[in-house]
Design a protein with these regions (language model features):
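Metal-dependent phosphoesterase core characteristic of DEDDh/y 3'-5' exonuclease domains
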Residues: 7-8, 23-29, 33-35, 39-67, ...
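Two-metal-ion RNase H-like nuclease active-site motif
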Residues: 7-17
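Ser/Thr-centric signal marking residues that sit
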Residues: 16-17, 34, 65, 228
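Polar, glycine-rich mid-to-C-terminal structural blocks
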Residues: 211-217, 221
Length: 234
């Protein structure tokens, strides 16, 4: 019987030349691997992607990130090689790919990147004990159910702000350069450590729910004949 690979997290982030994962291309990818206790293992990975000649960047994205097509043309890998490097990191057995808003954005960037370069866009998400997770939803869950131990900032509208840079500033977490992929990854790991330290049971419960089987198990506890409350947070 094949041994189960040890769990590790690949905390990662993209900076892109636009906000549409289907159309816009990645400019930068950064990742840090940690063990299950959030201790860093290995060296950080940071890559630039050489822009395609027929893909126009959004000027606003370049202004936000400070990453220009010229910089990526000089330092970047061809997209096929960039995609292979990203896929190899995420596909390592036992890896949980995780970021901040990664389910809605970064994972979609990865899927379209792999598809364009003739690589399986889904295998690294489930094969070999792998999975994916999103710390943004964990932060929202902690705010709603177990807010103690974390400072929750508010935006100009008076509502809770879950922007990574706001949470990092409110909690004294290092975040040297918002919209730099490696800086965003380090801030995400720091926030994960804070939530895990403050609310370990909630953290572990949310982590378990990355599995469809665990979600199905939770739902199977609900009996239609009996009134049951089911809370959805997103």
């Amino acid at each position: 019987m094949q041994a189960t690979p040890p769990l590790s997290f690949l905390w990662h982030d993209y900076e892109t030349f636009g906000a549409n994962p289907r159309r816009d291309r990645p400019a930068q990818f950064a990742a840090i691997r940690t063990d299950a206790d959030l201790n860093e293992t290995g060296e950080p990975l940071m890559l630039y992607c050489r822009p395609a000649a027929d893909a126009l960047p959004e000027p606003e994205s370049c202004l936000i990130t400070g990453i220009t097509p010229q910089l990526c043309a000089q330092r970047g890998l061809p997209e096929s090689e960039f995609a292979a490097r990203v896929n190899a990191a995420l596909a390592e057995p036992g890896t949980v790919g995780v970021g901040y808003n990664s389910i809605r954005f970064d994972d979609e960037v990865t899927r379209h990147l792999l598809w364009r370069n003739l690589l399986d866009p889904y295998a690294r998400e489930w094969q070999n004990g792998n999975g994916r997770w999103d710390l943004l939803d964990v932060a929202r869950c902690a705010h709603a159910l177990r807010p103690e131990g974390v400072q929750w900032p508010t935006g100009e509208d008076g509502l809770p702000s879950f922007k990574l840079e706001h949470l990092a500033a409110a909690n004294g977490l290092a975040h040297e350069a918002a919209h730099d992929a490696l800086s965003d990854v380090r801030a995400t790991i720091a926030l994960a450590r804070l939530i895990r330290q403050s609310q370990p049971r909630l953290f572990d419960f949310c982590l378990a729910l990355r599995s469809k089987e665990r979600v199905a198990q939770e739902l199977s506890l609900i009996h239609i004949s009996e009134p049951t409350r089911l809370l959805s947070i997103s």
